[in-house]
């Protein structure tokens, strides 16, 4: 009985300490993970499919196709933010 009570009190103290320390972080935006440097992924209104030639079709504009595993159907998605996915030498 004493062991269960002691274990319960230890857990209660750890939970209380965790709840107390959680909001103790800084309120300033800094570092590479801050929302000032964040990117956003948004699903477009269209779906996409993979044809027999293994090319994906159905996405328009800045949208591209995302799919799971070996599926031949996917959703169109658009990324907004500061991305630089250029291939070295592709613009030569």
Swiss-Prot record:
Where would I find glycosylation on this chain?
A: 47, 70
- Asked whether the keyword Glycoprotein is assigned, the reply is yes
Gene Ontology cellular component annotations, sorted alphabetically: extracellular region
Signal peptide stretch: 1-26
Sorted keywords for this record are: Disulfide bond, Glycoprotein, Secreted, Signal
Disulfide bonds, which pairs? 44-63, 48-65, 59-76
Localization per Swiss-Prot or TrEMBL: Secreted
- Does the keyword field hold Secreted? yes
List residues traversing the bilayer. none
Q: Which GO terms describe its molecular function?
A: C-X-C chemokine binding
Protein function = Salivary chemokine-binding protein which binds to host chemokines CXCL1, CXCL2, CXCL3, CXCL4, CXCL5, CXCL6, CXCL10, CXCL11 and CXCL13.
> Protein name, please?
Evasin P942
């Amino acid at each position: 009985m004493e062991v269960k009570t002691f274990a319960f009190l230890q857990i209660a103290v750890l939970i209380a300490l965790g709840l107390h320390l959680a909001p103790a972080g800084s309120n300033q935006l800094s570092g590479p993970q801050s929302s000032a440097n964040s990117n956003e992924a948004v699903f477009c209104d269209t779906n996409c499919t993979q044809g027999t030639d293994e090319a994906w079709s159905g996405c328009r504009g800045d949208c591209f196709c995302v799919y799971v595993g070996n599926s031949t159907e996917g959703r169109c998605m658009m990324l907004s933010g500061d991305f630089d996915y250029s291939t070295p030498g592709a613009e030569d």
